[in-house]
Design a protein with these regions (language model features):
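Short beta-alpha connecting loops at secondary-structure transitions
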Residues: 337-343, 425-426, 461-467, 518-523, ...
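RNA/tRNA-interacting regions in translation and RNA-turnover enzymes
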Residues: 1-472, 484, 577-578, 680
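Mixed-charge, low-complexity segments
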Residues: 341, 366-369, 373-374, 573-575, ...
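Short, acidic/hydrophobic/Gly-rich beta-strand patch recurrent on exposed beta strands
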Residues: 62-69, 572, 599, 728-730
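A carboxyl-terminal module marker
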Residues: 2-5, 27, 406-408, 415, ...
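Class II aminoacyl-tRNA synthetase-like tRNA-binding/catalytic domains
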Residues: 69, 86, 92, 102-105, ...
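His/Asp/Glu-rich mid-to-C-terminal helical/loop segments that flank catalytic regions of hydrolases
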Residues: 346-363, 538-542, 547-551, 744-749
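Beta-rich nucleic-acid/ligand-interaction surfaces
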Residues: 39-43, 253-254, 418, 422-426, ...
């Protein structure tokens, strides 16, 4: 919205410091997007055209004699509307108009001693074609007086950005209220008009379901001419039109915030009916002819009638918005500017708008009518502690009451003797946005200043609202995605299987009393105790279909001999790891450790220990227990060649893991060293029955300083009972770069422990 500081002075005395005014308005939430000075140039004065004569050498030029107070100047003018006895702004010698400095000049052989100016030449919006005609609306016209000494020609135009909930500030009066409250300066109200009705020509009838509030003044029509101060105000707001009646209505709406309209009446009396039209929108009918749709569309103004019926209207903005939304698919005749004002909340004090308009029309009021409608007060009660809790700032009761009263709120103490005291606040009817205690707190904060709030960290305690079942589901879904990323394909099988096949492969079976009493078929006569049987069948089917590289994954239920359900993960690979493709012309076969590495990418790091008991499906020398977090969680093995031959499979490996023993890893942060590490490779002569896991555990338990890791490198037979085991010791510090002496010390301590615990020695 645009308005000038001169407009604001109609209702409130604004501060002289315009920059401070803009800053304070922005603090109040009325963001000033631009502030443009509109000041007439120096040496531009009020002049009066005494005579006008045609130029002897140019048809479109006139030679005027202009009185500028101290003297009469001859000025050549090209405007068509220049005329004798006309007051106009005159630029004297030395005045700067745009980029031109006015000086004595000769135009087509005639001397000119100045320039009669238009509004645009002076830096103001366009008012009309030709020169600007001055009138007494801007002040008493004194010949020779500087134009910038008149308030309308020495002002600033503010462009204010409003939030949608502040419809009360879509008027000069609304902004003036805010300034009055902030600077504690009195607001100049719109004067009420005292009049005696002189006719009874209007018969007003409104249907019972009408929500709008309407008020009317009947006046005599007379010749209208828009004064210059109104033209300037409307031009600043891009609302000036050629229709004088429309200018008065737009000006009064712009200033008062009341939605105004006028109807021309050629005959009286009239039947004035307010009812819903075919679209269920409230409309005005005069003598049974539709004349307007309230808050949506007004008829074009014509001021040729004998009488004028002035109308002020108000409709609840929420009700209007709901009606428009319900009709969004219909094509309606509507005025977007009118809807914009109405849907954001116009001024419901209708008499303000009618009185303001009637005063500027200088009209005699013949009659007034209004619908029976009253606005309900919006009352809120709260304690001071409520405001303190919302804002985080303790504010004195007197200050809160003062702010609210300055804004037009009615404030009272509901229960004077109660502790703490309860304040009762009635919001003014033009503040449609005040509905809750939070809105009251926001009003107080606007005037206290958000910069005065003490910055505090947010005290937020978030409880863990996790669902353990969902967490488990997500955990195994992630494992499945990892398996898919490693090339495994997910399969699903029945929980039923053949008891004989399970026994043949060495898996446990259900105890006889717990067996199925009525199996589906003889091939599905028991509950499965392992996922591997089904994976073997799936591998065979894929082999028969021509696939040479098979990697399968399954998660499902199995049962122990007691028929207790257990969730397990099964992995099986068969055939080639890499298909026949360069650089592997014959493909690349799987090996035990490659398969183990793939499984570890899915379930995490683990270690292996030798199986103590073997079953027919396992290869006796390539099978192991899977150890994770010091617990046996499953088995990994190559499938015995005899089983491969009997089932007609490719060379295969499997792993089966108890899902209940897999732990969701916690996110742990570990420090890392910025210093270089040192490695020492050792070849140890050691008993062939010594497991590497025991060697690693012994060195870890010894807590040798700076020894961070020990890795197996190679193994080969040394003698009948001994092997040569190559290991790598990784040595580094978090605090410094180690020297050779410190590195050798760590290695020596490791050798001493290995010699003591395992009778190991360095190979000579």
């Amino acid at each position: 919205m645009k308005l000038s500081v001169n407009d604001l002075n109609v209702f409130v005395n604004t501060p002289k410091d315009i920059a401070k005014l803009c800053e304070d308005l922005s603090r109040l939430g009325l963001e000033v997007e631009s502030c443009i000075p509109c000041i007439a140039p120096k040496n531009v004065v009020v002049g009066k055209v005494l005579e006008k004569a045609p130029h002897k050498n140019a048809e479109k030029l006139s030679v005027c004699q202009v009185d500028v107070g101290k003297e009469v100047l001859q000025i050549v003018c090209g405007a068509k509307n220049v005329a004798p006895n006309q007051f106009a702004p005159v630029a004297l010698k030395g005045a700067i108009i745009g980029s031109t400095t006015i000086a004595k000049t000769e135009l087509r052989g005639v001397e000119s001693h100045g320039m009669i100016c238009s509004s645009t030449e002076l830096g103001f919006p366009k008012i009309n074609d030709g020169i600007l005609e001055l009138d007494e609306s801007v002040g008493e016209l004194v010949l020779g007086k500087g134009l910038n000494e008149y308030a309308p020609f020495n002002t600033h135009v503010l462009e204010i950005s409003l939030t949608p909930n502040r419809g009360d500030c879509l008027s000069v009066l609304g902004i003036a209220r805010e300034i009055s409250a902030f600077y504690h300066t009195p607001l100049k109200p719109i004067k009420a008009l005292n009049f005696t009705p002189k006719s009874d020509s209007i018969a007003l009838h409104a249907d019972e379901n009408i929500e709008s509030h309407l008020a009317y003044y009947l006046i005599y029509n007379h010749s209208l001419k828009t004064p210059l101060n109104i033209k300037l105000s409307l031009a600043h707001n891009n609302a000036l039109s050629e229709n004088d009646l429309n200018n008065f209505i737009e000006f009064s709406t712009h200033f008062s915030g009341v939605i105004l309209n006028a109807y021309g009446l050629n005959t009286t009396p009239v039947d004035l009916i307010i009812k819903n039209d075919e679209n269920n929108l409230e409309s005005v009918y005069i003598n049974h002819q539709k004349r307007s749709t309230i808050a949506i569309k007004h008829q074009d103004q014509k001021d040729l009638s004998e009488h004028l019926l002035l109308e002020a209207s108000y409709i609840d903005p929420i009700s209007l918005s709901l009606k428009l939304h319900a009709l969004k698919d219909k094509t309606l005749q509507k005025d977007n500017a009118l809807i914009y004002r109405s849907a954001r909340g116009s001024n419901p004090n209708l008499s303000d708008g009618l009185n303001f308009l009637s005063t500027h029309l200088k009209a005699t009021i013949l009659e007034s009518k209004q619908t029976k409608h009253s606005l309900k007060d919006r009352t809120l009660t709260f304690q001071l502690e409520d405001i303190t809790e919302i804002l985080g700032l303790a504010i004195e009761e007197e200050k809160i009451q003062g702010i609210l009263k300055n804004l037009g709120f009615k404030v009272s103490i509901k229960e004077p003797n109660s502790k703490p005291q309860i304040l009762e606040v009635v919001a003014p009817n033009f503040r449609h946005d005040i509905k809750t205690i939070q809105d009251i707190a926001e009003e107080i904060l606007r005037f206290v200043g958000i910069d005065n709030l003490i910055s505090k960290p947010l005290n937020c305690v978030s409880s863990k609202n996790s669902n353990p079942h969902y967490d488990t589901h997500r955990f195994f879904e992630n494992l499945k995605h990892k398996a898919l990323a490693c090339g495994f394909k997910e399969v699903i099988h029945y929980v039923f299987y053949s008891k004989e096949k399970q026994q043949k492969l060495g898996f446990e079976v259900l105890e006889d009393p717990l067996e199925l009493q009525n199996p589906i078929t003889t091939e599905l006569n028991t509950l499965r105790t392992s996922l591997i049987c089904g994976l073997l069948d799936a591998s065979l089917r894929n082999k028969n279909l021509g696939f040479k590289s098979i990697a399968l994954y399954e998660k499902g239920s199995v049962y122990n001999s007691k028929r207790e359900e257990i969730q397990k993960l099964g992995f099986l690979i068969s055939g080639l790891q890499k298909k026949e493709s360069y650089p592997y012309a014959k493909g690349k076969a799987w090996d035990f450790y490659s398969f183990a590495e793939c499984v570890s990418k899915v379930i995490g790091d683990f270690s292996l220990e030798k199986l103590t008991t073997q079953i027919p499906i396992n290869h006796p020398y390539q099978s192991a227990k899977i150890i994770q977090n010091h617990e046996v969680i499953g088995v990994i093995a190559k499938i015995h060649p005899k089983v491969i031959q009997e089932l007609d499979l490719f060379e295969s490996y499997y792993a089966e893991i108890d899902a209940s023993k897999l732990k969701r890893p916690a996110m742990l942060l570990k420090p890392f060293s910025i210093y270089p590490s040192s490695v020492r490779d050792l070849t140890l002569i050691i008993d062939e029955n010594t497991a590497f896991s025991k060697i690693k555990k012994a060195l870890k338990d010894a807590q040798i300083p700076n020894l961070s890791e020990i890795l197996p490198l190679d193994i080969f037979k040394e003698s009948d009972n001994t092997i040569a085991l190559s290991v790598r010791c990784v040595i580094h510090s978090l605090e410094k770069t180690l020297n050779d002496e410190e590195v050798n010390s760590a290695v020596q301590k490791a050798l001493e422990i290995l010699e003591k615990e395992f009778n190991a020695r360095l190979k000579g």
